[in-house]
Each structure stands twice: as C-alpha cells, then as structure tokens.
Amino acid sequence: MTSTKFETKPLFTRQQLTALLLPLIAEQALSVTIGLADTLMVSSVGEAAVSGVSLVDTFNTLMIQIMTALATGGAVVASQYIGHREEKSARAAAAQIMFIMSSFSVLVAAVVVVGRHAILRGIFGSIDADVMKYAETYFLLSALSYPFIGLYNAGAALFRAQGNSKISMMSSLVMNVVNIGGNAILIFGFKMGVMGAALASLVSRAVACCAVLFLLQKPGCMLRVTGLSAMKPDGKLIRRILRVGIPAGIENGMFQIGKLSVASLTSTLGTAAIAANAVANTTSTFLNIPAIAVGMAVLTVVGQCLGAGEKEQAVWYARRLLLVAYCGAWVMNLSAFFFADRWALSWFSLSPEASAMALEVMMWFNIVSLFFWPSSFTLPNILRAAGDASFTMTVSIVSMWVFRVGFCYLWVLKMGGGLLSIWMGMYLDWAFRSICFMVRFVRGKWLEQKVI
C-alpha cells in the first residue's frame, strides 16, 4: 500500500498494515474457537447449570460490550494524538481511559455483588430455584472479574492504538488457555461445576489484566501509564473520550437488548428452531473473523491519519481496508456456501428438521454477507475513528428497532413467519445500515468531525 502518491509520506507501509492485521485475525479466531470449547466444557455440568450460566452471560456480554465501547473512545483519542505527534497528550489520554474504565467497572461490580438476586429477578423474572442458585454463584464471581475485564480491554485497545496488535493477541492467548485449563481442572478434576467455571474465568481475566498493565508500564511503551498518580481526572480529556465512548456504548447496549428481544421471539418457534438458530449463530461467527479484525485495525489507521491532519490518506487507507474486509468476507462465505456449511452441521446432533432450518439460514447468511456485512459493521468503525460516533449510534439504534426487532415481530407474530423470517429482518437491518454508512462515507461528512 505504498505505491500510491501522497503529497506527504505515507503513514503506513504494507508491512505495517500486515503486521497489524494478522495478529488481530489470529486473536479473533482464537477467541471464537476457544469460546466454543469453553461452552462445550461448561455444558457437561448439567442443564440447570448451563441455563444459569447462559442467563448471566447475557448480562456479562452487555457489560463487556459497554466496556469495549469505552475502550474504543480511548483508543480513538490516543490514536489521533499519536498521529499528531503529541505523545505526552497520548499518554495522558491513556491514563484517563484507565481511570474511566476502573471507575466504571468497580461501580458496576459493586452494584452486582450487592444486588445480584434482584437484578436476576428483574431481568429474567421467575426462574427455577436450581437455575437461580447456579446463576447467583456465577454472577457473583463474574462481577468480581469486571474490573479485570475493563482494564484488560482498555490496555489492549491502547496497544492497538500504537499499531501493536501482537500484545493483545498474546494476552488473549494466555487468558483463553488459562480459562480452558482452569475449566478442565476445576470442572472435571475437582467437580466444582459452575463455581469452577466462574473461578477459571475470574483467574484468567486477572492474569491477562495484570500482564497488560505490566507491559503498559514498561519504559519503552509509547502510551506508558506510570501509576495511579497519572490517572488524576482530567475533565477535558474525559469529555473527548466519552464523546466517542458513550454513543458507542449506548449503541452496543441497545444492540444487545435488541438481540434479547429477538431471542425471546425465536423461543416461540419451537425446539427445532431454537437449536437451528443456536447452531447458525455459532457457525456464522467464524465467517466474520477477517472483517471484525479489519474493523479493529481501522480505528488505529484512520485515527492516526486524521490526527496527523492527513484526510486524503485516511480516506485512501479506509477504502483499501474496507476492500480487504470484503475480500475476507467473500473468501469465507463462498467457501462456507459451497463446502463448509453441511460439514459444520455434522458436528451437531440436530434433528432433520432443525438441520434443514439451520442450513437454509446459513446459506442465506453466506449470500447476504457478501454484500452487506463489511459495510454494516466494518465501515462504522471508520466513522468512529473520526469521532462520528453519534451518527453511527443513531443509525444503528433506529435500524435495529425498525428492522431487526419490528419487522421480525411483524413477520412472525402477524404473518406466521418462521426462523428464516427472523434472519431476514436482520438482513434488512444490515442493508439499511450499509446504505446510511456508505452515503455518510462517500459524502465525507465524517471527515468534518473533531476529536482533539
């Protein structure tokens, strides 16, 4: 990517972009693969235990998404300061995101520890006593891990902002290996069940968090956070971070709530549809790995370009990286459509009815993803890197409630649609988002935003 002529020196070489992207792809592949293995190990505990863990993980996912969004705000601000050659301000932004994340995660953890029973009752209503018992146990230990998750996410985002994605990849590897090893020992060795699974997650997150914090304090780190003294609140920097982080957090939070609404609708379609939907969700996650990795990379690349005042380079790299995301989507989805979908289904013990539904949904996913997934999910990160987070939030929330939720309920409850109707509502959501984001990108409105 160095062949294009700019008026100034290109900020990124092809080798630098490759070095940024490949670890991110490996990190995502690792996370998805080991996450599946983790789910299978926990499922050996029993149906009530799995139900309890599943309920809590719904809330955990919401919290992780919000913390990831806050970390994104810090990464965008730090990236732009790096591009502007203001390393002192970049380090100050790094310290502020650590302050924001630690404060938020400790507050949420305290609320959950004290009120976990009321929270579970309030969200999920009346559930069986044995499921509630397992859920409360898992919720307690999950809450204790929130500060570790938050600080790990912030630290990993800061390393990516520097263009160093190897650190987050290796930290993720360590975290997942410790988690799987802990599950094996505590669940199968000591027969600790849900408590063992929760302890393994807590320890793995603590280890990864400590590793990232240690590396952030090394003298050679550009975004070095020297200690608590550096984390003194700075209102100006906090506002800049939250200007990106809050809209992204609201967007992610609403997205999870929308998914819950659709999940409850899926449950009305019967056991076969529930099983088919679960399998389709699991397998489709693998197909998004390259585009997700590109979406993480553009925060660094576009952020640094705009921080340096190089709008021309920001647009050029954004287009090339979006093309890379599309190439990844085409390779993964065409391979799945012609070869892998049926093979993947053979890994699951599904009834013929559920297998047929899952295959239909998966093949439609392959087709629609070719055109809409990268522009619906990778492209908005380009806009966020410029500070255009309020626009992406507005579009995403409107699209989700109108298409992903509204159309799904209309088609299923009023028109008698099945599982494919629910997924078609999701595809309409993608199409609408893609059109809005592409128009915003082409018109250049996103380049008018100011972060620093």
Residues covered by each model-derived region:
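Small-residue-rich hydrophobic transmembrane alpha-helices
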Residues: 50-110, 149-168, 274-340, 373-395
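Hydrophobic transmembrane alpha-helices of multi-pass small-molecule transporters
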Residues: 62-65, 179-183, 209-213, 286-289, ...
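Small-residue hotspots at the loop-to-helix junctions and early N-terminal turns
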Residues: 47-58, 135, 139, 198, ...
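Short runs within selected transmembrane alpha-helices of multi-pass transporters and secretion channels
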Residues: 71, 141-160, 168-176, 197-212, ...
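Helix-terminus/linker motif at the lipid-water interface of multi-pass membrane proteins
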Residues: 29-51, 120-129, 185-192, 253-286, ...
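Short alpha-helical transmembrane segments in multi-pass integral membrane proteins
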Residues: 1-24, 78-145, 189-246, 302-368, ...
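Transmembrane helical elements of multi-pass membrane transporters/channels
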Residues: 19-35, 141, 175, 204-208, ...
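N-terminal transmembrane alpha-helices
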Residues: 8-40, 44-45, 61-73, 77, ...
